[in-house]
Amino acid sequence: MKEDTIIQKNLFAIDNENNEQKEITKIPEDLSWEDLKKESQKRPRQRKNTTNLINKFKTDLISKNKNVCINEESYSYKTVSKLKLTPVMKHYVTLKEENKDRLLLYRLGDFFECFFEDAVLISNLLEITLTSKDAGKEIGKIPMAGVPYHAMERYCADLIKKNYSVVICDQLEKSSGNYGTPIKRGITRIITPGTVIEEGMLIAKKNNWITAIYLSEENSNESYEWGISKADVSTGELITMEGQSLSKLFDEIIKLDSSEIIIGSNEVRNLLMNGNSQISYTVSQETNFGINEANYLIKKYFQIVSLEGIGLKNLNNATRSLGGLLNYLKKINPLNLDKDSSVKISLDFPQIQFCHNKLIIDYQTQKNLEIKNTQRENNYVGSLLWSIDRTYTCMGARCLRRWIDSPLLNVNEIYKRQNIISNFIESKQVRMDTQNLLRAMGDLERLAGRACAGHASPRDLIAIAEGLKKLPRIKSIIELFKYDLPDWTDQLKNIDEELLELADTISFQLIEHPPLNISEGGMIHDGVDNILDGLRNLMDDYSEWLNQEELKERKISKISNLKIQFHKNFGYYISINKSKVNLAPQHWIKRQTLTNEERYITTDIKNKENKIFQIKSRASSREYEIFCELRKMVAEKTKQIRSIAKSIASLDALLGLSITSVENNFIKPALIPINDSQKKNSTKIIAGRNPIVEQLLNDKKFTANDICFDDNQKLIILTGPNASGKSCFIRQIGLIQILAQIGSFIPANKAEIKIADRIFTRIGAVDDQSSGQSTFMVEMSETASILNQATSSSLVLLDEIGRGTSTFDGLSIAWSVSEYLAKKIKCNTIFATHYHELNYLKNSNKNIENFQVLVEQNNDQIIFSHKIKKGGSNKSYGIEAAKLAGVPREVIEKAKLVLNSLEENNKFNKNND
């Protein structure tokens, strides 16, 4: 059987093995909707739970390389005369002029094509063939490059990753078949890095933020006021904030990790680029950040009469940024502000983010503590998130990532999260049942978003239904929980019955495994729609007619293996083996000759073929209408689906943390509120461990250590040799603090932890080439930021200060900084240093204590125990550490001689003094 044919019986899902000829009554033609309904009632169809068979996806090959001869003047759409272009190219240029900064993919037949500069660009970006196209007699050939229509999403994903925006111009109607008749085309989608909703273009476990920044026009860097609004259009999340000073704005921008940042002018772009030249911005000069426009757009979008109801009263900068964001989204998707439209971007009410209700972790601290990525290689493996993420859903993974970005300050809210973890730990069966429920759950947040935007496929709706059907079982698990639980669990205990009804409706209408392409048909169950059932009855009748026609032609020709088959290009035909050609009757019309096969058509078959195509087309159109109505029903429940999805995500995040706790022997810490005056700055961790390093060690045992902060011990001077574990210990304290404040259990035997308002770190330093700052200046800038912003409730982690200058200058700065932190700020601080002279600070400061990393020395060999104990060290073991690192022996021996000489000189100088 040839690959380019499809057996007719498979096409209609009819068994053709029975060769007995049946008498067929005349098939009715041109039935109205009412006639089809009556036909359906005469012969009701029985529901079948069958699996829809989809042909395997075949990748089309891009056209082979050709010698492209292009007139230099025809290279750019800007230089050609539109009057001289063909109608299609004239339309292309018109659309391109409206989207100068975006790549335009224009549908022509089975390909999306680019022309002029865009063609040259995407041929390089996507490594596809650059060819040419005739644009008119006077224009000649122009550059052209294209991608197959069915692979468009994959190629768009590559362009989006390279930070390009794409405009999709698709065919809005099918070809009439009449040569020369223009096909209606129009822009159906604008895809920018921040407005992606397609599954293949998103990172499943990470939010895809689009951000708008409003910056006030002030002169002084510290007097700049700003507003930031960011949204994930795929999940509906919307966050807005405002603040003051460029330094804080720069830090927030780096932490945003946005796919696209919208600003209003090149002046703002130039100002922001001074803070970090590696971040790219989208300048949208037509985007309005005005306060009046913002008020109007926000009220219209959220259908409210006052901004006070969503918390934006008197937050003018946040309001302006949100208005700018909505303004930009309106231009990307013009339907998103039309409340009557079933196709729009759906965003939740904005969450107003304030500094006073979360633990602040600046970008430098995130980087130093390797919270989401490692510092050196920027890898996920080896980060804090990697060490604790055991989530089963993409929603849960994104939720955990958000928690790590913004740990809590409210002790009661933290305890409620701990209580969920406790319930999971106490019952292995409950834990396993929840794992099984969540394991195969789809991404309800993004699935609902695609439905709302009109891009959900039948398979997306099936995934939504399957997820919603699990809600009653999740409810039964939540009802088993004891202790005080978070507010979001109420939604899981009081399920919206309309969501369950929606799930039943989806399952009733859609088959279990629908086709990928909604235009194919075959996705709606029998018995759902009378009109569709009537059309399918007619299709069955025509299928039976073809079966009988095949039997008839076999009898006439006496060719027993004759088949009536179908080809997508020339329809139904009679297929016989070439050896039987002499038996072909006269009424057969030869259609095609192949190596081992002859193909014929007959007048009767061609007449029926037209009717079959009409019925199939009407059936496919009817199925599409039914599906669109179903998708609209889902879209109307987007907010409810996303709301329940967020609760499931939180449950999944806490389930994952409970699994991490069980696997790694974590314990539940006691917490002390910030405003507890009796236990001010009191923190005690017994046998604490670094959660990242412990897992990276695999079978090796991690050395646990204690830490204590109280009124008599606010600043710890930590000394010890390089590679002994000082940095690991410092990071360990910061990581445990973060874990405690997201509600997680922690790696320790016992702990009582004071809530911190900020975590500051200064660990290592390198030149900042983008701003022209030396290592020492970077170090001093970070130190200044800590001293100016830390409070008595902060946690400060310092690993060396003053190394980038002379010994005495560096020691003096380190000494002064230590005293300032201990006496003035009085926050919990660990300062790891090689300046052993700092051990003397203890003598004049009651709240400073010395600790050291123990080292065992055997002749020239040193053994790191990684154990922390009270008391200062007076030796760095630098040469021994260099030897362990593999420094050549000759260099080591020379270093020993130099060290002895320096020590002798130092003694001589002291004696002379």
From Swiss-Prot:
Gene3D superfamilies from the UniProt entry: 1.10.1420.10, DNA repair protein MutS, domain I, MutS, connector domain, P-loop containing nucleotide triphosphate hydrolases
GO CC annotations on file: cytosol
InterPro entries reported for this sequence: DNA_mismatch_repair_MutS, DNA_mismatch_repair_MutS-lik_N, DNA_mismatch_repair_MutS/MSH, DNA_mismatch_repair_MutS_C, DNA_mismatch_repair_MutS_clamp, DNA_mismatch_repair_MutS_core, DNA_mismatch_repair_MutS_N, DNA_mismatch_repair_MutS_sf
PROSITE patterns noted in UniProt: DNA_MISMATCH_REPAIR_2 (PS00486)
Extent of the signal sequence: none
Family: Belongs to the DNA mismatch repair MutS family.
Protein name: DNA mismatch repair protein MutS
